[in-house]
């Protein structure tokens, strides 16, 4: 959506947000019972790649994945047909969310490498038939809000000049907003569950306090306690990504690793035991010389960690969250489920922290999760 799609900038933003939330409550349930569930990640990635190829908006991409989830949930589909289904979902979503000239053409889809490599050729008749089947399955209703439909509205209030970075006033508000959008988009790719949790997770990574201010509570209508569990899982997935990126960088050679702003700390990690979700509110001791007065929410340091010591140049951002729980990286999920990655969060987890990658006061560097 272009100008008319930027509803969060208009006078009716609050009303539209309320209508989307109402529709979200009536979304079809996703049960994850497809016989081809193991192939879901491949086809979700296919949709993401094709979306990026044609520069489709995030709402179109996420709607396409959600349509694919629901359709796979109801039918037993062959692998060859799944290519047709996935691309048809993307076409329907782009027709619903984008302008007409942005919708991919049949010839463009057939020229994609994934199609030519598998000797697959889409025909106009096949696409029309599949689109009709999809529309009938969803009762001709494609107004299915995903987190991508809410994220821009929430980002409009995600960063404010009154926010504190590491307990101090922000030096560069615009760059903070830029990285807030980057992290929100990153977390959005991990989970389609709650856009508000993506914003909160991004604020945690950027060490903004208070973590969930009153304005965001009022804007999203989500309380901090409601978001805690989802935020925790998003951060686990993010830190697994950072760990993998650091591992790949280390394999590239010690010299390239030394040039990186984000490096793995040399000190051994220490196990920290916590219980969910109370660990998000435990006290935190750091090597900071100054502390900001208590605020309405726990600080970012209190949320992300419990008793680890950070090495500071100017200001830092936590990373390297190592857990015994293994995520699968960028797994998109249906709106109705908590997460589509095999992460079972136990009541009590044993977690080792080793956080040291740094972001200075001007945020000039992107964390490893953006380099993959």
UniProtKB/Swiss-Prot annotation:
Keywords: Cyclin
Record GO terms (molecular function): cyclin-dependent protein serine/threonine kinase regulator activity
Gene3D superfamilies cross-referenced by the UniProt entry: Cyclin-like
Domain Cyclin N-terminal: 15-143
CC annotations in GO: cyclin-dependent protein kinase holoenzyme complex; cytoplasm; microtubule organizing center; nucleus
SMART domains given in the database record: CYCLIN, Cyclin_C
Keyword check for Aminoacyl-tRNA synthetase: no
Record has Lipoprotein as a keyword: no
Similarity comment: Belongs to the cyclin family.
Name this polypeptide is given: Cyclin-J
Organism: Homo sapiens
């Amino acid at each position: 959506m272009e100008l008319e799609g930027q509803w969060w900038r208009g006078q009716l933003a609050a009303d539209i947000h309320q209508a989307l939330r109402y529709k979200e409550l009536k979304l079809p349930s996703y049960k994850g019972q497809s016989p081809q569930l193991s192939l879901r990640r491949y086809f979700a990635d296919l949709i993401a790649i094709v979306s990026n190829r044609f520069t489709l908006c995030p709402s179109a991409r996420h709607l396409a994945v959600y349509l694919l989830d629901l359709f796979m949930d109801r039918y037993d589909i062959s692998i060859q047909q799944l290519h047709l289904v996935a691309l048809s979902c993307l076409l329907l979503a782009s027709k619903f969310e984008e302008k007409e000239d942005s919708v991919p053409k049949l010839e463009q889809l057939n020229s994609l490498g994934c199609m030519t490599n598998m000797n697959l050729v889409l025909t106009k008749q096949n696409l029309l038939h599949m689109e009709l089947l999809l529309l009938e399955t969803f009762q001709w209703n494609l107004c299915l809000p995903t987190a991508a439909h809410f994220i821009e509205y929430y980002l409009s209030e995600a960063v404010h000049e009154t926010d504190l970075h590491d307990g101090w006033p922000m030096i560069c508000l615009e760059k903070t907003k830029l990285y807030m959008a980057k992290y929100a988009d990153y977390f959005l790719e991990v989970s389609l569950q709650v856009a508000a949790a993506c914003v909160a997770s991004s604020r945690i990574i950027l060490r903004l306090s208070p973590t969930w201010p009153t304005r965001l509570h009022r804007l999203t209508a989500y309380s901090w306690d409601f978001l805690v569990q989802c935020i925790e899982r998003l951060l686990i997935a993010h830190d697994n990504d950072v760990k993998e990126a650091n591992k790949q960088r280390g394999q590239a050679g010690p010299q390239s690793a030394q040039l990186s702003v984000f490096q793995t700390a040399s000190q051994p990690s220490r196990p920290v035991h916590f219980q969910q979700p109370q660990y998000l509110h435990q006290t935190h001791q750091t090597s900071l010389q100054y502390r900001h007065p208590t605020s309405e929410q726990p600080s970012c340091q209190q949320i992300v960690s419990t008793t680890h010591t950070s090495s500071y140049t100017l200001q830092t951002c936590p990373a390297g969250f190592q857990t015994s729980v293994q995520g699968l990286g960028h797994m998109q999920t249906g709106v109705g489920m908590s997460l589509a990655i095999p992460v079972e969060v136990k009541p009590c987890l044993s977690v080792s922290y080793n956080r040291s990658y740094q972001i200075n006061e001007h945020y000039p560097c992107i964390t490893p999760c953006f380099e993959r």
